[in-house]
Amino acid sequence: MSRFLICSFALVLLYPAGIDMYLVGLPRIAADLNASEAQLHIAFSVYLAGMAAAMLFAGKVADRSGRKPVAIPGAALFIIASVFCSLAETSTLFLAGRFLQGLGAGCCYVVAFAILRDTLDDRRRAKVLSLLNGITCIIPVLAPVLGHLIMLKFPWQSLFWTMAIMGIAVLMLSLFILKETRPAAPAASDKSRENSESLLNRFFLSRVVITTLSVSVILTFVNTSPVLLMEIMGFERGEYATIMALTAGVSMTVSFSTPFALGIFKPRTLMITSQVLFLAAGITLAVSPSHAISLFGITLICAGFSVGFGVAMSQALGPFSLRAGVASSTLGIAQVCGSSLWIWLAAVVGIGAWNMLIGILIACSIVSLLLIMFVAPGRPVAAHEEIHHHA
């Protein structure tokens, strides 16, 4: 079992590492490529676009051909793209490399969740996904620090060589440690089971909405945090970094505590708790009379996301034993595109950073609470863990 957990964690971590590792070198990258920092900030969106593009096909291929045939090319593409970015001499080539990096990371991301669906039952999967969420929260804190240390002695290209080394590690795990987990194709007489795993399942769609809104909340917070904390609340850059590190600490603590909570409370209870925390955060930020109260509201956001997201993702994947790859892709596409669309629309309409965050918090909590209470899970699908024996 440990081999599947290690490989899944490694496959997922390429995604946040690709986002956060290079940010510290952005000023030097812009100077060397004769581009403005503003022009290169689009590299974040280009990376997410690459991930979304990968998810359009990676899930289907993973369900038809297996998890390894997607993970191995995905890791290889991430390596090649990282090297390509390090060798880029124009901003156009750099952005092309970032898109390819996103493609590779997207393939690995989809496979990781499919593997967890293949090998774990519902309760254990919820616990593991909560732990994975906590580990993912470490990356935005550690990656810039590691990038800063690297750049003390080496040029910005070394950041992408470091990502390439990470990709090589994932490739080696995928080649030599990971075993195939895709369930055997059903017999012709059992095709009804595969056909019953519809993406239009009400329960699955409800969890797609809940997880997409939750990701929209956390990405809205990350996207608006410089404006909220430095421009509106007046904190210095160093204080901003400290606050963001503390919020990551809250996320990690809650994420690592959630598996223990799942041994006491039902998953539904934790999901309701998550949305109540979002609602409390929205109300707190809306009526806050002081910076201290506002910071408390921000910690509620991090706690709310960490306590509920892994559980919701596990529930979303639950109905799919034969189409876990497609289900994982659908979740990823919805989360990336839905959150990006909200942030873009809010900016176009002219909604301020503060109201943008409050609005998505309250909308997410109300819609999600209604879905949790009125859309019940269907009959659970078995088909996990015994898969190992024919891997």
Swiss-Prot record:
The chain crosses the membrane at residues 4-24, 42-62, 69-89, 93-113, 131-151, 158-178, 199-221, 245-265, 269-289, 293-313, 331-351, 356-376. The keyword Nuclease does not apply. Keywords: Cell inner membrane, Cell membrane, Membrane, Transmembrane, Transmembrane helix, Transport. SUPFAM superfamilies: MFS general substrate transporter. It comes from the Bacteria. Pfam families: MFS_1 (PF07690). This is Multidrug resistance protein MdtL. Residues 1-3, 63-68, 114-130, 179-198, 266-268, 314-330, 377-391 are cytoplasmic. It is a multi-pass membrane protein. InterPro entries: MFS, MFS_dom, MFS_Efflux_Transporters, MFS_trans_sf, Multidrug-R_MdtL. Belongs to the major facilitator superfamily. DHA1 family. MdtL (TC 2.A.1.2.22) subfamily. The keyword Transport applies. Residues 25-41, 90-92, 152-157, 222-244, 290-292, 352-355 are periplasmic. One of its GO terms (molecular function) is transmembrane transporter activity. The gene is mdtL. It is found in: Cell inner membrane. One of its GO terms (cellular component) is plasma membrane.
